[in-house]
From Swiss-Prot:
Belongs to the RbfA family. PANTHER family: RIBOSOME-BINDING FACTOR A, CHLOROPLASTIC-RELATED (PTHR33515:SF1). One of its GO terms (biological process) is maturation of SSU-rRNA. GO terms for cellular component: cytosol. It comes from the Bacteria. GO terms for molecular function: ribosomal small subunit binding. It comes from Francisella tularensis subsp. holarctica (strain LVS). InterPro entries: KH_dom-like_a/b (IPR015946), RbfA (IPR000238), RbfA_dom_sf (IPR023799), Ribosome-bd_factorA_CS (IPR020053). HAMAP family: RbfA. The gene is rbfA. Keywords: Cytoplasm, Ribosome biogenesis. This is Ribosome-binding factor A. Monomer. Binds 30S ribosomal subunits, but not 50S ribosomal subunits or 70S ribosomes. Residues 123-143 are annotated as: Disordered. PROSITE patterns: RBFA.
């Protein structure tokens, strides 16, 4: 249990260090625009999956290649910043959860709009039924 807490703390520090490096030390504007969303470390701290996202989806492939080329820089910078016996192997992965969330949000909005149209149609039908019933009731009273 304590090991899991340590892994989470180290992962949090990794995220902070890499984010800081992206903001301060990376000169490539596209790569610097990436946002680190999560760091997943193995229990023995030998492997790190670093999830990132970027505003321009079309830049994702370029950024992936740039991260791949910059692995050594990030590993050495992490080694200097954090006191770890072993600096993990880094794997940068594009985080699709934001894109997925946006797609889900769009589908929800479409469903809400469709529901709204159905409700409006049902309201019109009900109003017409009430009017028809009122006319019939008035006609019966007049007889």
């Amino acid at each position: 249990m304590a090991a899991e807490g340590r892994v989470q703390r180290v992962a949090s520090e990794f995220q902070k260090v890499i984010s800081l490096l992206l903001r301060t030390r990376i000169k490539d504007a596209k790569l610097a625009s990436a946002t680190i969303t999560e760091v997943d470390l193995s229990k023995d701290l030998s492997y790190a999956k670093i999830y990132y996202t970027c505003l321009a989806i079309e830049d994702a492939e370029y950024i992936d290649k740039a991260f791949e080329k910059s692995k050594g820089f990030f590993r050495s910078s992490i080694a200097k910043s954090l006191s770890l016996r072993i600096v993990p192997n880094l794997k940068f992965i594009y985080d699709t959860s934001l894109d997925y969330g946006m797609q889900m949000e769009e589908k929800i909005q479409q469903a809400l709009e469709a529901d709204s149209k159905i409700i409006k149609q049902d309201d019109k039908s009900l109003q017409e039924n009430y009017k028809q019933n009122d006319k019939e009731t008035k006609a019966e009273k007049l007889r």
